[in-house]
Amino acid sequence: YVVAHFHYQLSMGATFGLFAGFYYWFPKIVGKTYNETLAKIHFWVLFIGVNLTFFPQHFLGMSGMPRRIPDYPDAFAPYNYISSIGSMISFIAVFVFAFTVYDALANGEEADSNPWTEPGFFESTPVYWLESNYATSLEWAVDSPTPFHAFHVVPKPVSYTHLTLPTIC
């Protein structure tokens, strides 16, 4: 049970968060877009793979399978077999991810400065509408990838209205 719970936290909590951050920031860092269909395939293949790997381990732990021993009783073989298949599927997801990154670098279109079309908030100069696309934070107001010394002056916020908390009646 401990093995399943621990790896659920690592593989599905932390790792999926890292992939989400990668896919969100990739166009900004590299300056190219990726194929969203390939990214969704990567997500679903990895999701199915890690669930097939770690969900059966809950049953193994509750059935008393010991950890850290070189050989397990044959009674645990079916669930271990399912976990092994899930690991192979997760391994395939690694190749889908690698191909997604390769495809983006080789064939990706140029990314806009604000590829996710975040709404406006900052202005950097009096002609900010020529330089940026009204981003909610500074990183979306400059080109992708971000050039060195991106701002000539400190940008100032246009409005703080979206930052106010709702009033409770």
Predicted regions mapped to residue ranges:
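Hydrophobic cores of alpha-helical transmembrane segments in multi-pass integral membrane proteins
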Residues: 2-31, 35-69, 73-119, 124-160
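Conserved small/polar residues in nucleotide/adenosyl-binding loops
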Residues: 161-167
